[in-house]
Swiss-Prot record:
It comes from Bacillus mycoides (strain KBAB4) (Bacillus weihenstephanensis). HAMAP family: LrgB (MF_01142). This is Antiholin-like protein LrgB. The gene is lrgB. It comes from the Bacteria. GO terms for cellular component: plasma membrane. Keywords: Cell membrane, Cytolysis, Membrane, Transmembrane, Transmembrane helix.
Length: 230
C-alpha cells in the first residue's frame, strides 16, 4: 500500500538527524563515531523504530534526497579537472592502482564473509561496499543483496577510512600525494575524498578519480565474479 505520509517528513527527519550529527562532530573535535553521515543514519533508524514509522513512510521524502547522490558523485570531477596534468602524466599508474584495489576489495570481502559463515544474501550485500551508495545499491539489488545492509556497509566503511585513513597512511609511510589520494578514494569513497581535501588539492583530485573508477570497476567486476561464487 502506498504511503500517505507527506514527502516533507523524510526530508525533515534527514536534515535534523544530519544537523545533530554535525553539531556532535564539531563539539567532539572530530571524534570519528560522530561523523555526521553515521550519526544521521543511526538517529534515523532509532527515530523510525521508536515512532513506529515504516521505511516507506520515511522514504516518500527520503528518496528525494537520494536523487541527488548521482549529481553529487559527478561533482567529484571538479578537483580532478584542476589536476588534469598529473592525470595525463601518471594515468597508467593511477588506473592500475585503482583497478587492483577495487578487485582486492571484492575478493577480501568474499573471503572474510565465507570464513565467518555469512548468509549468501548478506555476503552479496557486502560485495559492492567499495563503491559509492549511488552505485552500490543498484548492484546489490541486481545480485540478490539487501540494499539496507549495503547502505550500512558503504557508510561504515567510509567512516572507518575517514577516522583512520590518515593514521594508516602515516603508519605505512605513504608520503606521495598521488598515492595518498588514490588510497583514500579507493577505500573510503566520498569520505575518503573529504580526507583528501583536508590534505591538499592533489590528494583530493586523486581521491575523486578513484571514487569514479572504483564505481565503474565494481559494476563490471561483481557480475563477472558472481558465477564463480554462486
Amino acid at each position: 500500500m502506498a504511503s500517505t505520509m507527506t514527502p516533507y517528513f523524510g526530508i525533515v527527519v534527514s536534515l535534523i538527524a544530519y544537523g545533530i550529527g554535525t553539531l556532535l562532530f564539531k563539539h567532539s573535535k572530530g571524534f570519528f563515531l560522530f561523523t555526521p553521515l553515521f550519526v544521521a543514519m543511526v538517529l534515523g533508524i532509532v527515530f523510525l523504530k521508536v515512532g513506529n514509522f515504516t521505511f516507506e513512510e520515511y522514504n516518500t521524502g527520503g528518496k528525494m534526497i537520494s536523487f541527488f547522490l548521482e549529481p553529487a558523485t559527478i561533482a567529484f570531477a571538479i578537483p580532478l579537472y584542476k589536476q588534469v596534468d598529473k592525470l595525463k602524466k601518471y594515468w597508467w599508474q593511477i588506473l592500475s592502482a585503482i583497478v587492483v584495489g577495487s578487485i582486492c576489495s571484492v575478493v577480501v570481502v568474499y573471503i572474510v564473509a565465507k570464513a565467518i559463515g555469512l548468509d549468501t544474501a548478506v555476503m552479496n550485500s557486502m560485495l559492492p561496499q567499495a563503491a559509492t551508495t549511488a552505485i552500490a545499491l543498484p548492484i546489490s539489488e541486481s545480485i540478490g543483496g539487501i540494499p539496507a545492509i549495503t547502505s550500512f556497509a558503504v557508510i561504515f566503511n567510509a567512516v572507518i577510512v575517514y577516522a583512520l585513513g590518515a593514521l594508516f597512511l602515516k603508519t605505512f609511510r605513504v608520503k606521495h600525494p598521488i598515492a595518498k589520494g588514490l588510497a583514500l578514494g579507493t577505500a573510503g569513497h566520498a569520505l575518503g575524498v573529504a580526507v583528501g581535501i583536508e590534505m591538499g588539492e592533489v590528494e583530493a583530485a586523486m581521491a575523486s578519480i578513484a571514487v569514479t573508477v572504483v564505481g565503474v570497476v565494481t559494476v563490471v567486476v561483481i557480475p563477472m565474479f558472481m558465477p564463480f561464487i554462486g
